[in-house]
Every structure is written in structure tokens, then in C-alpha cells.
Regions:
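Short, well-formed alpha-helical segments that are part of the catalytic scaffolds
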Residues: 14-28
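A conserved acidic beta->alpha catalytic loop
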Residues: 24, 38-50
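Short beta-strand/loop segment that forms part of the nucleotide-sugar
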Residues: 33-43, 63-65
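Glycine-rich, basic loop-to-helix element that forms the pyrophosphate-binding segment
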Residues: 65-82
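Short aromatic/hydrophobic "clamp" motif used to bind/position activated sugar donors
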Residues: 87
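Conserved donor NDP-sugar-binding/catalytic core segment of glycosyltransferases
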Residues: 98-132
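Short, flexible, basic/aromatic active-site loop/helix in glycosyltransferases
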Residues: 137-175
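A short, conserved alpha-helix in the catalytic core of glycosyltransferases
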Residues: 170, 176-195, 199-227
Length: 273
């Protein structure tokens, strides 16, 4: 069978949401074949058993990892099983409420060969647009966003720009980077940059691949003409007080420092195009 795209969902203790996600995804009306890879990093038998219910569907592969291999490595470990022109990375909580979403995303990529990464509008459970667009990060702003520093006059406008609060989320537009909660990545780009960067464990690999897209003369585009639903909960959410309680937030800081060190002398590659 010839596949147009491969969908990858990486799960960590959200198996019921993955089932709901896949059931809505399999109802998408498309004129091409796609395959699905579900990766479980939970190391939890109950979670794995729930995911295995999806084996009754064709073109779905379930991969249960014996240890949490991290976000980028888990995706790269299935590189030999990816087929088609596109890779769709999807978070477990995504829901496909309209049946033409997937087709619209792929058609737009087909018709715009200079796009390397495309992400749809996301609507959370309360009906608000999720802010999935960001500027290439600066550590001092990432810290400021989570503390009182965000309200200081000298930083307030910079934080707003970092969070892209000024953007019109109803407009198709080029952006620095997109959160990888739901993105289409051109397979040619994926192969060129060797997938997601394993310098990071949990965060920043989505920033990195968008950086590399621009470096390799591919555009990163926010596509507002179709939308998916998300639960609106971000694993990296939380203020400074949560830092000492949350291993996830501490990992976010570690990965952010790695990114900043790696790109310390680099200019914004988007400005080249």
C-alpha cells in the first residue's frame, strides 16, 4: 500500500485521550492512505493495555517502550517505519471535530512546496484559540514569563512579543516556530535534519526543527483555515513556585539552556528568507 503520510502520537499516561483522538482521526475524509504509529513512553501496563485496543484497526502500529526514551528519541526510533511525503506529529489530546481537517493540511502542503512545517489553529475546550506560535526563545524571557518580571515596563513588551500576543490568529502567516502539539512536517526536511534533535530530552526539539527548517530555506507556516481541538493543558505550564515541585519544569529549563548554548551566536534564520 502506498501511503501519503504517517501520523505519530507519543503518549505518556494519556491512553484514553489517544483512543478518542484516533477515533476522530480515522473518520477524516481523505483521498489518500495514511498510517499511524502510537508510541507509549508511560512504562505503565494499564496504560499500554488501553492503547492496545487500537490494534483492531488497520494501519495502526503500537510501540510500547520499556523506558521513557524522551520526546525526540521516541519519534526518531520509528524512522524506518515512516512512509509517505509527510509526517504528522500529534499530541494525545488533539480532537478532529471536522472531517476535512487532515485533507486541508496535506493539500496546502502539496500546493506550497516551500513550506517545511505547517500547523493548524487550535481551539481549547473553553472555545479559546490556543497560542501555539512563539518567537525563537530567549532564556531571560522564558523566566520572566513565569514570574512578576513579566510586568516590569522594561520587559512587558518583550514578553508579549515572545508569546506572539500581537498576532492575528485568523491569518495564514509565516512564524518563527510552532509548538509540535499538531504539526505537519515535510519528509524531505525530516530526512535532511535527521528527525528531531536528540540533544534535548523533552522540550525544544520542536523549536530546533523549526530553526532548521528556516536554515534549510523551508518556511514554517501557521495555517488558520482549519482547526483542531485541544485540552489546553501544557506540560510546561506553571510559575516559578512550581519549579521546585515539578520535574517537568526543571527539564524545560535544562533543555532551554541547551538550546541557548547551541545557538548562542546564531541569528534568527527566518530573516534570511
Amino acid at each position: 500500500m502506498n501511503f501519503k503520510a504517517t501520523i505519530i502520537i507519543l503518549d505518556f499516561l494519556k491512553a484514553p485521550q489517544v483512543l478518542e483522538n484516533m477515533e476522530s482521526l480515522l473518520e477524516q475524509k481523505v483521498d489518500f492512505n495514511f498510517k499511524n504509529i502510537i508510541i507509549d513512553n508511560s512504562c505503565n501496563k494499564k496504560n499500554a493495555d488501553i492503547l492496545k485496543q487500537l490494534e483492531k484497526y488497520k494501519n495502526i502500529k503500537i510501540k510500547i517502550n520499556k523506558k521513557n526514551s524522551g520526546y525526540p528519541k521516541a519519534h526518531n526510533d520509528v524512522k524506518n517505519e515512516i512512509d509517505g511525503d509527510y509526517i504528522l506529529i500529534v499530541n494525545p489530546d488533539i480532537l478532529w471535530k471536522k472531517k476535512n481537517i487532515f485533507a486541508k493540511l496535506i493539500n496546502y502542503m502539496d500546493n506550497n512546496q516551500d513550506i517545511g512545517i505547517l500547523g493548524p489553529k487550535q481551539i481549547n475546550r473553553s472555545g479559546k484559540v490556543e497560542m501555539t506560535i512563539r518567537a525563537f526563545p530567549k532564556i531571560y524571557l522564558q523566566v520572566a514569563r513565569r514570574t512578576f518580571l513579566r510586568y516590569l515596563p522594561i520587559l512587558k513588551s518583550k514578553v508579549k512579543y515572545d508569546e506572539m500576543q500581537h498576532l492575528d490568529y485568523n491569518k495564514i502567516q509565516d512564524v518563527d516556530w510552532l509548538q509540535s502539539s499538531c504539526v505537519v512536517i515535510r519528509k524531505k526536511l525530516w530526512d535532511k535534519v535527521n528527525g528531531l534533535c536528540e540533544d534535548y530530552f523533552l522540550f525544544m526539539s520542536d523549536v530546533e526543527i523549526c530553526f532548521q527548517a528556516w536554515e534549510n530555506n523551508y518556511r514554517v507556516v501557521y495555517f488558520s483555515k482549519t482547526e483542531v481541538c485541544a485540552d489546553g493543558k501544557r506540560s510546561s505550564a506553571g510559575g516559578f513556585n512550581q519549579f521546585f515541585k515539578s520535574g517537568v519544569l526543571r527539564q524545560h529549563l535544562k533543555d532551554s539552556i541547551k538550546y541557548r548554548v547551541k545557538h548562542f551566536f546564531d541569528k534568527n534564520p527566518r530573516k534570511k528568507i
